[in-house]
């Protein structure tokens, strides 16, 4: 099997081929070589596949759209912008927060919601993703929300679906988790006392295997954050991560000193092929987000985590449940961001069809 991907070959490659690539390089191969058909010619969203390729104005437009789903008291509101449309949730990987918040977002927008039971689907019987996709298209859904263990699966589906269907990436392998990245940006936008351009952000944990880290770093850079710090054992850092324009720290205390935002990441045990840590207790000792380390950050700093958390390994319970934690706010903000992305994707599809494409 070839170790290279080019945009000409995408329609004939199964997404399972992408899992052959090492997480050290998967982001480069996907972002440099894959066709990214996520924008219409007018710049509106046709599919939402990743943060890369979107500019600052487009990210700010998503944040601004999400803000419209909060009332004056900060409570989420319903708005039937997708009434009469059908959204199909295709989660080929287990999920609690992402799947549930997408479903809540879809229902708040008035959409008809179809949840496909993947455990009973034909993909479990050996059917290819392409054949599964073509059969699901016959159900006349307007939007597919896709989570898959193969990096590039959402891109693959975007090249295969009919023009009247939008694909939203709910997380693909090691590659990207764009709605998580955007809900993190919305959270920072709502909680930080300073604009993005003046923030120092520390990202701590399993960066090598984290699709969240890739999306967050890309979004932070696009929104103008100049001081992005990462800290993890060398075994959990992608090779050459410095090329992303981040500062790499080996010492956790130095990394979080004077930071505005500390973002913890889960250790991706299900994606790690062999042991990369001495022990959980050693990890917590050197890299855990503790009250003592939070005290090194700025007085108004806050902590974030995409979940699920490993308490006592990645983060102390007193921090996760403390006054500086915005972790539960992230969940609520996730509903607003997913409402925004769903609404903008449907607007983009209507614009695409109106243009006669």
Curated annotation (Swiss-Prot):
InterPro entries the UniProt entry points to: Asp/Orn_carbamoyltranf_P-bd (IPR006132), Asp/Orn_carbamoylTrfase (IPR006130), Asp/Orn_carbamoylTrfase_sf (IPR036901), Asp_carbamoyltransf (IPR002082), Asp_carbamoyltransf_Asp/Orn-bd (IPR006131)
Enzyme class at the top of the EC tree: transferase
Catalyses which reaction(s): carbamoyl phosphate + L-aspartate = N-carbamoyl-L-aspartate + phosphate + H(+)
Region annotation (Disordered) ranges: 1-21
Record flagged with keyword rRNA processing: no
Top-level taxon of the source organism: Bacteria
Protein family (similarity comment): Belongs to the aspartate/ornithine carbamoyltransferase superfamily. ATCase family.
Xref: PANTHER family: ASPARTATE CARBAMOYLTRANSFERASE, ORNITHINE CARBAMOYLTRANSFERASE, MITOCHONDRIAL
Protein's name in the database: Aspartate carbamoyltransferase catalytic subunit
Organism: Psychrobacter arcticus (strain DSM 17307 / VKM B-2377 / 273-4)
Gene (UniProt): pyrB
